[in-house]
Design a protein with these regions (language model features):
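Hydrophobic helical h-region of N-terminal Sec-dependent signal peptides
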Residues: 15-18
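C-terminal motif of bacterial Sec signal peptides marking the signal peptidase cleavage site
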Residues: 21-23
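Bacterial N-terminal signal peptides that target proteins for export
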Residues: 2-13
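Bacterial signal peptide processing site
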Residues: 25-27
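C-type cytochrome heme c attachment motif
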Residues: 51-63, 104, 121-127, 175-179
Length: 225
């Protein structure tokens, strides 16, 4: 019989315990992102959002076309040529009724841009077409007014903002766009006049028959194969 003090199994137990603790500490350290890693992820999100903003031609309406170095990049209408005529007058000059919509300043300026809105509010605007100033800073889980944090009396973004198409973009893409607008742009103080459009344009003209549902109907529909 081996004396207790010389039993190799008794010596092995504390060694294994020490190794296990060290391994746990190393594992925990490996799973926690460092400040630099967190910053890198945020930078990649902003860069991805920039790519989407350029490729989706946001500057075509909000200023700067597809050139982030251009004067007036995303800071809103600066000339009547950037305005949009809505109604019969868009086809026949002078016809009535006639409304004018003006793309807003998308830079993070608190007074004249979107700086006062959170990234979640911007996401909700892109996903649901809701005006960010009247949108809660929470996740929305329904498209039915009054349910799932969806506003009871929703007010929608003015045309030609193509939110019925953008709403089908993945969450990570819409959040990346919000991140770029909030954290990737310099604030520009430029007040854009309010649009002279029909109130709640989308609320009065939007129908699932014309614009489909969110989420979109499952593939294939009657027009697909």
């Amino acid at each position: 019989m081996i004396p207790p003090s010389r039993d190799p199994s008794r010596l092995l137990i504390p060694i294994l315990a020490t190794l296990a603790i060290a391994g746990c500490n190393q594992s925990s350290a490996a799973t926690l992102p460092t400040r630099n890693e967190t910053s890198e992820v945020a930078s990649k999100q902003v860069a991805f959002g920039r790519f989407l903003v350029i490729s989706h031609d946001c500057g075509g309406c909000h200023g700067g076309e597809t050139n982030p170095a251009a004067m007036g990049w995303l800071d809103g209408v600066r000339s009547p040529i950037q305005e949009f005529k809505i109604g019969p007058c868009a086809i026949t000059p002078g016809a009535q009724p006639c409304w004018t919509t003006r793309p807003k300043n998308l830079t993070p300026d608190n007074a004249t841009g979107i700086g006062r809105f959170t990234e979640r509010q911007i996401f909700n605007a892109l996903r649901y077409g809701l005006r960010p100033e009247e949108t809660p800073d929470v996740a929305i889980t329904s498209t039915t007014p009054g349910k799932g944090n969806f506003p009871v009396n929703p007010h929608y973004l003015a045309v030609p903002m193509p939110w019925p198409a953008w709403r089908h973009m993945p969450d990570n893409e819409l959040m990346a766009i919000a991140a770029y607008l909030k954290r990737g742009l310099k604030p520009v103080s430029h007040k854009v006049e309010d649009s002279e459009g029909p109130p709640d344009f989308w609320a009065s003209t939007y129908t699932t028959k014309d614009y489909g549902t969110y989420p979109a109907q499952r593939y294939p529909t009657v027009n697909e194969r």
